[in-house]
């Protein structure tokens, strides 16, 4: 997805979602895709814990988690993870990302 804006529709299936381009893209649907997520450029915002499907996330740019709840997906890559939005968010996956963590709002557990 080489675009910005908000994508509200549900994404399903076994494929991978790839975020490219410098813009900010928000995924707000309750997605069930299983092929994982690759963030190669820009910022990908997840507005709920289901927004990134069930696969692992490779973050080589910026992943913004604008939600509370429990995020089960494993996060790897060289990019930054940002917690925004109200509420407490628990990262329960086997995370190995190296780009640092920014908490701009809410609580990260």
Regions found by a protein language model. Name each.
Residues 87:
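Acidic/His metal-coordination segments adjacent to aromatic residues that form catalytic metal sites
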Residues 4-14, 24-78, 90-109:
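Surface-exposed loop/turn positions within long extracellular repeat scaffolds
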């Amino acid at each position: 997805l080489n675009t910005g804006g908000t994508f509200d529709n549900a994404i399903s299936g076994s494929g991978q979602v790839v975020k490219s381009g410098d813009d900010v893209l928000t995924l707000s649907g309750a997605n069930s895709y299983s092929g994982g997520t690759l963030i190669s450029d820009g910022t990908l915002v997840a507005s709920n814990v289901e927004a990134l499907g069930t696969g692992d996330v490779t973050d080589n740019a910026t992943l913004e988690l604008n939600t509370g709840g429990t995020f089960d997906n494993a996060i790897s890559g060289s990019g930054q993870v940002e917690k925004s939005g109200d509420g407490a968010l628990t990262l329960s996956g086997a995370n190995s990302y190296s780009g640092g963590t920014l908490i701009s709002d809410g609580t990260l557990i």
